[in-house]
């Protein structure tokens, strides 16, 4: 895959079905060993994302979705925007690259898109404590655990510990 054949652009609602078709398998793969497949079946689906999750996320002021595409097909996506509690920080809600397109710099290019969209804002995100692949990616990009913790409870009795990461572009506290 040649980097020159990859285009990064803002997604439009018409793109959502193709984005979800790419996003869903890599999302499931990212949760392998963290949540059982039957639980994933209960909490996410491409149809749900196209009809509800993507539109609701993007209704938040300042939020956007960007996609990486090759040959007119999405091979990566990211969603980000101002954090509700701290609008001076930009939260990355999602960054996924199709499995066969990983390790070609696409995730880094999508992350750079978010960084350039808000050049002076600190970037924050949540990462499942057990998601070592994602944690490694962000740590290589100079994100650091920032002391925040969160337990995601997608279903009754299902608890998924998360840690907060932050890329400091202002002076870190302390």
Swiss-Prot record:
GO terms for MF: acyltransferase activity, transferring groups other than amino-acyl groups
Enzymatic class: transferase
Enzyme Commission no: 2.3.1.-
Keywords for this protein: Acyltransferase, Transferase
Residues spanning the signal sequence: none
CDD domains from the UniProt entry: NAT_SF
Residue ranges annotated for the N-acetyltransferase domain, each copy included: 6-172
Record has Acyltransferase as a keyword: yes
One Pfam family matching this protein: Acetyltransf_1
Family classification: Belongs to the acetyltransferase family.
Protein name per the record: Probable N-acetyltransferase Rv2775
Source organism (scientific name): Mycobacterium tuberculosis (strain ATCC 25618 / H37Rv)
Lineage: Bacteria, Bacillati, Actinomycetota, Actinomycetes, Mycobacteriales
């Amino acid at each position: 895959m040649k980097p020159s054949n990859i285009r990064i652009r803002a997604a439009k609602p018409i793109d959502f079905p193709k984005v979800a078709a790419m996003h869903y398998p890599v999302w499931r793969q990212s949760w392998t060993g963290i949540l059982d497949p039957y639980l994933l079946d209960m909490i996410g689906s491409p149809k749900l994302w196209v009809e509800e999750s993507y539109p609701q996320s993007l209704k938040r002021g300042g939020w956007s979705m960007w996609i990486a595409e090759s040959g007119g097909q999405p091979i990566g996506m990211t969603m980000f925007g101002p954090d509700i509690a701290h609008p001076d920080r930009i939260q990355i809600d999602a960054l996924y690259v199709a499995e066969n397109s990983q390790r070609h710099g696409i995730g880094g290019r999508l992350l750079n898109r978010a960084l350039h969209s808000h050049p002076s804002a600190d970037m924050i995100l949540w990462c499942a404590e057990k998601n070592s692949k994602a944690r490694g990616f962000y740590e290589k990009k100079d994100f650091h655990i920032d002391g925040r913790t969160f337990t995601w409870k997608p279903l009754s009795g299902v608890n998924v510990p998360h840690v907060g990461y932050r890329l400091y572009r202002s002076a870190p506290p302390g």
